Amino acid sequence: LELIGGGIPFMAKTGMYVGLDIGTTSVKVVVAEYIEGQMNIIGVGNAKSDGLNRGIVVDIDQTVQAIQRAVRQAEEKAGIQIKSVNVGLPANLLEVESCQGMIAVSSESKEITDEDVRNVASAALVRSTPPERQIVAILPQDFTVDGFEGIKDPRGMLGVRMEMFGVVYTGPKTIIHNIRKCVEKAGLGINELVITPLALTETILTDGEKDFGTIVIDMGGGQTTTSVIHDKQLKFTHVNQEGGEFITKDISIVLNTSFNNAEALKINYGDAYPERTSANEEFPVDVIGKSEPVRVDERYLSEIIEARVEQILRKSKEVLDEIDAFELPGGVVLTGGAASMPGIVDLAQEIFEANVKLYVPNHMGLRNPVFANVISIVEYSAQLNDIYHIAKYAIPGEKSKPAQSV
């Protein structure tokens, strides 16, 4: 057992794990088989999603249908039946706080048991959570037994007094309820509710990047999530409800063409950095109300795209400047479907005046940032250890259940 990522209690697993990412543009499912900690993706599903707006569920039935379509695709490819999933939770209105608890060890022998770990986690959660919020996760970071600090797993040790130090994440009840409702209505159980930026920062960055501090910007279809990890902890998240769909809408409005045409133009000819494009390269655009296609040059399309991408990135810069995040040495990592746009790294480097790189998953058939979240949900869920699971059942409403997920 090793502790990767300061605080997130991880261990290598064997078994089957399923990740579910309910995005604004699409719902992604990944089935992964772990053999002694080695991950092998055996099934993928990706279904168009119409039930979300700006990252939030607005139509439960449509979201349920998209989940079922994505699950069916993954089941067919993997040749298994999916009964339960690990589902990503967006960072909207997420709050992060440190917590600590202290107890007297209960058994007469003074040997620390699972029950003591659960009790000390309960003591750390004695706080008033506002009625509209609920605890999403508690992550034990270390324990102190009779003054001995830095213990990662105190079970089996002897002690009279035990303390736990950790981090607690809370989120809005409405968002959590709607996600649970959609998954359950789709006929699936939930193993882990995983905070997506927590899984993402934990699994796509190196130990050094997590330790010294790095910014991760996840550019989705409906929203952009900016996260900061430092000292191996997710310290900050911010959600801007603008994403790749807004770029498509801008193209549609400016060029007076349908949303589907605009999406095709963005994918086939789009570039976020006009300096890299040519005003002489032209392509035909079907314009509403005109019988003949209109010729549009690459540079003009790029300027439309640049305006929106710049606005999205500048909003991230504003919130990051407030917390001096650009002083962290890890620079900026971009990911998410909208980040696959050519030229986006150049533009981001110009805006942030920092080192920027694009993260692309390194799995065959999934080498697209659109799959970064769903893969990280699987990896994160598979690596959670016993201490995490014991502490989790200190959260009101959590019932003890196995970690595996098929």
Model-derived regions, located:
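Glycine-rich phosphate-binding/hydrolytic loop that grips phosphoryl groups
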Residues: 357, 361-405
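Glycine-rich phosphate-binding loop of actin/hexokinase-like ATP-binding domains
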Residues: 212-254
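Residue-level signature of catalytic and energy-coupling elements of molecular machines
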Residues: 20, 29, 87, 183, ...
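Glycine-rich phosphate-binding loops at beta-strand->alpha-helix junctions
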Residues: 171, 271-273, 328-349
